[in-house]
Every structure is written in C-alpha cells, then in structure tokens.
Amino acid sequence: MHALGRTPALTLLIFIYNFVSVYTIVSVQMGTKARLCCRSIPLTKAVLITWIIKPRGQPSCIMAYKVETKETNETCLGRNITWASTPDHIPDLQISAVALQHEGNYLCEITTPEGNFHKVYDLQVLVPPEVTYFLGENRTAVCEAMAGKPAAQISWTPDGDCVTKSESHSNGTVTVRSTCHWEQNNVSAVSCIVSHSTGNQSLSIELSRGTTSTTPSLLTILYVKMVLLGIILLKVGFAFFQKRNVTRT
C-alpha cells in the first residue's frame, strides 16, 4: 500500500465533520462485529473516499483511499479498525471485535466531481451486565447487575420494600444493586428481573420462611450449654471411676 501525503484537506475534513449534525445511531454489543457503510454512490464517480474516526476521549484518525492512483492513507493502525473489503470494491469500515474504546463518531465522505457526500454514525457500545444475587437477613434479597452499559433496570415479583442504588465506573459502565425486603410470611420465592438492551434475565430466589427472631439464637445457646455440661459430666465421671480403680488396687 502507498500512503497519501498529509495535506490541509484533512484539517478541512475534520472541520466539516464537527459541524455535521445528522447522525445514524448504531448500537453494537461489545465483542461482536460492526460494519459501517458509506453513502450509496457509484465508485466510478468517486475521486476520494475518506473515513474520519473520532472515538470519545481519544485522538481522531483517518482511513482514506484515492481512487485514481489507488493510494491509501491509514492512521488508525492498532485500533482494530480495517476496511471491510478492498476499498476499490466496497469502502465499508469494519471493527472485528467492538470494544468500549471504539465508541464515538464515524464519518464517511465520498468526494466526487458533483460534490461531497457524507454519512455519519454515532457508534454506541453495549455491555451486558453480570447478574448475581444473594440472600440477606430477615427475608431480604439482593440482586446486582454489575458493569453494564447502559445501566440495567431491576424489578421484583412480587413487589417488596425495595431500595435501588447505582454506581458509575470510569469506563462508562454502571453497576445497579437492588435490595428488597418482604414482610409477608406467605412469600416463599421471589423473582429478580434484570432488563437490559443486550437481553433480559430472570432469577428465582428462595426466601427463608418466617422472619428472623431471637428464638433460634436462644436455642443455639441452650444447645451449646447442654453439650458443654455433658462434656463436663463425662470428664467428672471418668475421673471418679479412674480414682475408684486406683483405690481398689
């Protein structure tokens, strides 16, 4: 491949890019493939095809193809962004495994003698949350959707007395935790429903019957005391019989 020389045209393209306001929003799940297409313009009319990639929080880069000389200029090396095919056949852009760092805006500009044609994408990366749960005390259950993007929504069946909190992370993901309590003793099982753009999950949770009280603790203490008393009696009895045997001899 040959490289196109850097020209002030790149600065002009980025300037135009910043003022383009019509976006096509594309949501892609992390780890899957993304393919972005240019405008449907016959390549026989194209003079220059340029992709301007502007990831959020990262420097911009370009992928350009000059039709007449078949020269390319690519400054996106190491970002897992490539042509979907050879640009002289299909000038689509491809990301083989989408990651959070690919989120941002992508502009395809096709330059023709009749003018320039643009298509802009706002690539949004979806991250499925890791869903877990655990039982708390006194007929309480906790359901957690960790590191999802966007934030997951948690609901319960049947309804209980619930408190939901969210924690945002530096990479844009969000952890949502819902803690729910049920007073009714007749509720023995509940369901935690986690709703997310990548798919919904439902977890069935068995609750302990009855509310937690001091009775089990008292029974435990009584049981421990009885065991200790039994051990003491055994030791006393063993010492008594041992002493008796010594006296006989």
Swiss-Prot record:
Residues 113-208 form the Ig-like C2-type domain. Belongs to the CD200R family. The gene is Cd200r1l. Residues 25-124 form the Ig-like V-type domain. Expressed in bone marrow, spleen, brain, lung, testis and thymus. Residues 1-24 form the signal peptide. According to PubMed:15187158 it is a receptor for the CD200 cell surface glycoprotein. According to PubMed:16081818 it is not a receptor for the CD200/OX2 cell surface glycoprotein. Involved in the recruitment or surface expression of the TYROBP receptor. This is Cell surface glycoprotein CD200 receptor 2. It comes from Mus musculus (Mouse). One of its GO terms (cellular component) is external side of plasma membrane. SUPFAM superfamilies: Immunoglobulin. Residues 25-220 are extracellular.
